[in-house]
Structures are given as C-alpha cells and as structure tokens.
C-alpha cells in the first residue's frame, strides 16, 4: 500500500513537472507548421493558422536586411530590429524570433525585460558591456564585457541591458529569443512614461526622491 501511494505521488509529481514545463514557454506545435493568419478576427493565445494548403515559401521568408546598419541617432544611441511573428507569420507556434541590435559609440539598449522569452546574444562587431539583475531579494548584477564572437544569455523575465563602452566605434549584435512574440518592457519608459502616468506619490515613495525629480524624469518620456 505504501509502495502504491509512493508510486502515485511520483507519477503525480512528474505529471505536474511536465505540465509546468509545457506552460513555461510558447505552446509546442501539433502540426508541421501553423502560419499565422494575421487578418483573422479570431483572438487566441497567439494567432490562428491559415489553411496549410494555402501556405507558401513566402510565409517563412522575410527580406529583413539584417546585414544592413540601422539608424542609431536617438537619445540612447541604439536600434533594435526585431523579426517576430508579426513580421514573419511562419514563426507562429515555433517559439523563436531574432533581432539585430545596432549601437552607436557609447550607445545603450536600456534596462528592459522580455516577459515571455530567454535571449541568447552574440556580438558581431565591436565590444559590448552586458548584464542582468537577479530577482529579489538579492538583486545581484551579473555582467560581462563581450567581444566579437562572444555569446551571453539573458534568462527569461530578468532585467538586462547592453552598452557599447567604446566612444569611437559602433557595435553590432544578433539575438535569438525563445518566443514567437517575446515582448519587451523598457523599465524607465514603463515607470516614467506610462499612460496614464503613475501617481507622483507612488513614484516619490518608491524612489525616495521629491516631486521635482519625478517631474524631471517623467518629462523625458
């Protein structure tokens, strides 16, 4: 009887683990492919499939020109070119997307998170200082200087950043993300540029600064 109970608990635990794993990332495909029907009025977790008989090679192709430099003339000096399911419908249900990241000298991809994806990141040109911060209560910063050909991984959901420390040369990187639609939350934009704005009282208490500083920060976004 004890042995049977243990076996039942073991099976239940394994099933629970398998179920957790199944919902921890994009759902696994149940067919060869599921090209997203971006025009369908049906709303599901992801996108409904177009008729597979109407699929063509173009559904799995995007002339994204990821070999071409992007404009980094902005406040932070960086540009992210993402190819996800919205640009490439064939990615639907496949659990992956790709991005090119361009950095001006001293350019920054500000602290942000991807709520639905782990990111693996490799430098193609230049040098980048990258890092992520662990969750509460430790909030440890794990960081590294990457050179051409180096690879770094950012765990799903954790705040991370990339910065070009070179004042004279640009940098380029490619990232792959473990979701067809990884999402991005840029921390400063979300906190100080939300719509409608977060109450000054909340931000003043959270950051332990006065209203003048909060107003200054909100004005940037």
Curated annotation (Swiss-Prot):
Binding residues annotated for Mn(2+), in chain numbering: 112, 114, 119, 160
This protein's record includes keyword Manganese: yes
PROSITE patterns (alphabetical): GERMIN
Cited CDD domains: cupin_OxOx (cd02241)
Annotated glycosylation sites: 54, 79
Bridged cysteine pairs (disulfide): 34-49
Family matches, as InterPro entries: Cupin_1, Germin, Germin_Mn-BS, RmlC-like_jellyroll, RmlC_Cupin_sf
Keywords, in A-Z order: Apoplast, Disulfide bond, Glycoprotein, Manganese, Metal-binding, Secreted, Signal
Keyword Cytoplasm on entry: no
GO CC aspect terms: apoplast
Pfam hit, one: Cupin_1
A GO molecular-function descriptor: manganese ion binding
Principal subcellular localisation of the protein: secreted
Additional remarks: Member of the 12 germin-like protein gene cluster located on chromosome 8 in the major-effect quantitative trait loci (QTL) for fungal blast resistance. Partial suppression of the 12 germin-like protein genes increases susceptibility to the fungal pathogens causing rice blast and sheath blight diseases.
Subunit structure, interactors included: Oligomer (believed to be a pentamer but probably hexamer).
Family membership noted in the UniProt record: Belongs to the germin family.
Full protein name: Germin-like protein 8-2
